[in-house]
């Protein structure tokens, strides 16, 4: 089953990974790139917002517990800005607190197939 990446306009879907753990970002990058996605990384919410201003992704994955700006504030800021409010958000966190404004959530540790399936569904639902 090919769950990836190509949007309706033929462009490769872009995913922004926001997580303070380098190993998690690395693992997610490998999974997404192997499936054909373009990946950008940020180590906290503030860096994620800066990255989004430079180039808007088709999907954002974020942790909840991070320094500088946690995932909940990050999501709140995305949702309150008309330019970013509709970006699908996948929370990937070991924290059981569910970000209400996120589209869906996966726990850590996660299965690569579940991660790819959730990403593909969110990108597809967004019209990608």
Regions found by a protein language model. Give the residues of each.
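Receiver (REC) domain active-site loop signature in two-component systems and cognate sites
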Residues: 66
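Helix N-cap/capping motif at the beta->alpha junctions
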Residues: 41-50, 71
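Hydrophobic/aromatic residues positioned on beta-strands within the core alpha/beta folds
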Residues: 90-92
